[in-house]
Amino acid sequence: MKTHHLKIWPQWFDAIRLGSKSYEIRYDDRGFNVGDRLVLEEFKAGVGEYTGRTIEKRVVYISRGDDAEAFGGLREGYAVLGIGPCA
């Protein structure tokens, strides 16, 4: 299992924090695997700075754009990461 530190914009950070968003769509350049820990670090892109707020989640499911089972519309090289609480 790996730990991945990822920037996340405020609107997506809050949706995950409030429980209304349970996935992340990411460029799959890190070798994500089920069981990996994500440290989501809130980042204000327009200002170019971190806010200091973080959320930790666990990858519970992965659908990759280059998998035969992946739904149409997901670009090759990207992945949908189903995320859940860290145990």
Enumerate the predicted regions with their spans.
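Short, charged beta-turn/beta-strand-edge "cap" motif at the junction between a beta-strand
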Residues: D28-D29, F43-G48
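Glycine- and charge-enriched low-complexity intrinsically disordered segments
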Residues: I62-A87
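A structural micro-motif recognizing beta-strand termini
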Residues: R26-D29, G84-C86
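Short beta-strand-centered aromatic/proline hotspots
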Residues: V47-S63
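Compositionally biased, charged N-terminal/linker segments
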Residues: M1-R26
